[in-house]
Design a protein with these regions (language model features):
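Compact, glycine-rich, soluble single-domain proteins
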Residues: 1-106
Length: 106
């Protein structure tokens, strides 16, 4: 799973709106984001809400024309419907577990 970061104003504003699809195995991360909409979308999404880099909620199969938010989140990952599991696996792979007695990595 390739996680692409929406880190410019333009990519955050446009996101995936208007695209016919998102290539399988790719997802878009929106840092500092607690609410998203799927207006202008042409396909359903899985939303993986993150708090401190860890999944706090997953909304599966969010169809176009919807609004979702998660107060517990500080970021969200948008992926093709059905790919939330791959996103979570990639997040775990990218963040090794803390050693006993250490705090998890930020």
């Amino acid at each position: 799973m390739e996680l692409l970061v929406a880190d410019s104003r333009l990519t955050r504003l446009v996101g995936l709106a208007g695209r016919r699809s998102l290539p399988r195995g790719r997802a878009l991360v929106f840092p500092r984001c607690r609410s998203v909409h799927t207006f202008g979308m042409r396909f359903a999404l899985d939303l993986v809400w993150l708090g401190g880099g860890e999944p706090v909620r997953i909304d599966r199969g969010v169809r176009p024309g919807r609004v979702r938010s998660c107060r517990a989140a500080d970021s969200v990952v948008e992926a093709n419907a059905g790919e939330a599991g791959a996103v979570v696996a990639e997040l775990k792979r990218a963040r090794p577990p803390a050693r006993p007695g250490e705090s998890p990595a930020p």
